[in-house]
Amino acid sequence: MIRRYWNINLKEMLETGVHFGHATRKWNPKMAPYISAKRKGIHITNLTRTARFLSEACDLVFDAASRRKQFLIVGTKNKAADPVARAAIRARCHYVNKKWLGGLLTNWSTTEMRLQKFRDLRMEQKTGGIHRLPKGDAARLKRQLFHLQTYLGGIKYMTGLPDIVIIVDQQEEYMALQECITLGIPTICLIDTNCDPDLTDISIPANDDAIASIRLILNKLVFAICEGRSSYIRNP
């Protein structure tokens, strides 16, 4: 895999607070190699290592995107939801940003049925079929459609398991991570100082609580994905 330059600089990461970890009492000792200092009871992440692993992750997703691989971005907590949706839409990736439904990947046949139901209801809505139903039935289907849009809207075009899953908060998305591990799907995780780097394939040490930090990391990754997709288009 060829190493590329992704314009990752320490000043930008400092300005967005990527280096701020959790309170020292909440740390995971496995994160010791990624921590450079303690400041006012908070662990400080080693940004040199963050830059290195982020660059490696960008190389990986570029290479995967250039081979038409499919990505799923997961981040369901409030601070991650909007950056995840924006990043995924920009890079034409699938995403989950509201709630991880148990078995979403490991019980894919059930997820496929839900997605088909979602597509059918969307078509009914577009063609006006729902509005021609009795008022009670129409209201029930509209509620069902709203529920499916909320939780499956980001994966409505997904036709199979993703090739790579990008996870914003390892602890918050532990169920998603476990499903990826079970299925052998490679993962890229933002890991804060309270996380376990051994659980993911590529760990990016970073503040997973600050919107600016999340946005910066995701922007670098989706830029690499977009570049990879462009590379495929230029060299099919």
From Swiss-Prot:
Subcellular location(s) of the protein: Plastid, Chloroplast
Keywords, sorted A to Z: Chloroplast, Plastid, Ribonucleoprotein, Ribosomal protein
Pfam families found in the cross-reference section: Ribosomal_S2 (PF00318)
Protein origin, superkingdom: Eukaryota
Keyword Aminoacyl-tRNA synthetase appears in the UniProt entry: no
Family: Belongs to the universal ribosomal protein uS2 family.
NCBIfam families: rpsB_bact
Protein name per Swiss-Prot or TrEMBL: Small ribosomal subunit protein uS2c
Source organism of the structure: Populus trichocarpa (Western balsam poplar)
Top-level taxonomy: Eukaryota, Viridiplantae, Streptophyta, Embryophyta, Tracheophyta
